[in-house]
C-alpha cells in the first residue's frame, strides 16, 4: 500500500461522531468563494471569515473575504505529517508532489512554507543522513565535515525525524503568507533555510553554521528571481527543494535523487507562466 493510499484509508468513515463541518475550500483564489484575490500596498484591518479574529491583512478576495494564515493552512499538517513520518521515499521532489496532492493543501498558501523543510528533512533522513538527536544525540551534519557513513536502517517511528519535522513546522509557521511579494523573501526559500539550520544546529551566535543556511536561502532566491513572477507556490517549492538537495550533496555529502517533474497543477493556477515555467508539461 502506497503512502498516499495509507493516508486516504485513514480518512475512511468510521463509527466515531462526525467532525464539525469544514468551511468551503476552493483549490485556488478565495478559499470561500474561489474569486481572485486583491492585494494592497499597505495592510488593512480585516476579520477572518473562518475564525472571526481580526488581523492586519494585505489582501482579500473581490467579494471582501479574508482568511488568516492559520485557517488557510489548518489541517494540512494532519495529512502530510503521517505520510512523511512513514515514508521511505528518497527523492524530495517526488515526496513534495505526494504532499501537495493531499487534501487541505491549496494551490498557493503558507502551508508550502512548512512543506518544503519537512520534505527535505524526510528525504535527508531517507538517504542516510543523521538528524539531530539520532544515535549519539549530536548533530551529525557539519558545515565543514560531511556526515559520517549512513546510519543503520531506521525504524517505522523515528523520534529524530518526528522532532526535527515538528521543529521545522514551529519555525515555518512564523513565516506569513505573501512574504515573496511584500518582503522579497519567498517562504519556500525561508523553508529551505530552516531545513539547513536544523541540520547544522545553527543559531544567531553559531560562528561556523550561521552563514550556511543564509547562503542556501540566497541561492534559492537567486533561482526564483531568474525564473520570474508572478508567484507560484508549487514552482518555487520545487526550485528550492532542488537547490537545497544540490547544496546538501555539496556541503554535507548526502546525495538525494531528483526526478524530472512535469506540473499537474497548471489548470488550477490563474497566473501560470505556461511555457516559461521550467515545470510546464509541454516544454
Task: Give, region by region, the residue ranges found by the protein language model.
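Residues immediately within or flanking Cys/His clusters that coordinate Zn2+
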Residues: 27, 45, 58, 65, ...
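Conserved phosphate/anionic-ligand binding catalytic regions in large, soluble enzymes, centered on
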Residues: 112, 179-198
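A short glycine/serine-rich beta->alpha loop
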Residues: 58, 99-110, 173-184, 224-231
Amino acid at each position: 500500500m502506497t503512502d498516499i493510499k495509507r493516508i486516504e484509508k485513514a480518512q475512511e468513515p468510521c463509527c466515531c461522531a462526525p467532525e464539525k463541518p469544514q468551511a468551503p475550500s476552493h483549490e485556488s483564489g478565495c478559499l470561500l468563494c474561489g474569486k481572485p484575490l486583491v492585494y494592497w500596498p499597505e495592510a488593512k484591518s480585516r476579520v477572518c471569515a473562518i475564525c472571526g479574529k481580526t488581523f492586519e491583512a494585505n489582501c482579500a478576495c473581490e467579494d471582501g473575504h479574508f482568511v488568516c494564515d492559520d485557517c488557510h493552512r489548518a489541517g494540512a499538517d494532519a495529512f502530510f505529517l503521517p505520510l512523511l513520518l512513514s515514508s521511505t521515499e528518497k527523492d524530495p521532489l517526488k515526496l513534495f508532489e505526494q504532499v501537495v496532492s493531499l487534501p487541505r493543501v491549496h494551490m498557493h498558501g503558507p502551508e508550502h512554507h512548512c512543506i518544503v523543510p519537512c520534505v527535505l528533512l524526510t528525504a535527508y533522513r531517507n538517504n542516510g543522513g543523521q538528524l539531530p538527536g539520532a544515535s549519539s544525540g549530536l548533530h551529525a551534519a557539519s558545515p565543514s565535515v560531511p556526515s559520517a557513513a549512513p546510519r543503520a536502517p531506521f525504524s517505522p517511528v523515528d523520534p529524530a525525524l518526528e522532532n526535527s519535522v515538528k521543529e521545522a513546522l514551529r519555525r515555518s509557521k512564523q513565516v506569513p503568507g505573501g512574504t515573496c511579494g511584500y518582503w522579497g523573501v519567498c517562504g519556500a526559500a525561508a523553508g529551505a533555510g530552516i531545513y539547513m539550520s536544523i541540520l547544522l544546529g545553527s543559531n544567531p551566535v553559531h560562528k561556523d553554521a550561521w552563514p550556511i543556511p543564509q547562503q542556501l536561502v540566497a541561492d534559492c532566491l537567486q533561482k526564483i528571481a531568474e525564473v520570474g513572477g508572478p508567484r507560484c507556490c508549487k514552482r518555487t517549492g520545487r526550485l528550492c527543494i532542488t537547490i537545497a538537495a544540490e547544496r546538501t550533496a555539496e556541503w554535507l555529502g548526502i546525495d538525494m535523487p531528483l526526478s524530472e517533474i512535469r506540473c499537474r497543477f497548471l489548470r488550477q493556477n490563474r497566473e501560470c507562466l505556461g511555457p516559461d515555467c521550467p515545470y510546464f508539461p509541454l516544454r
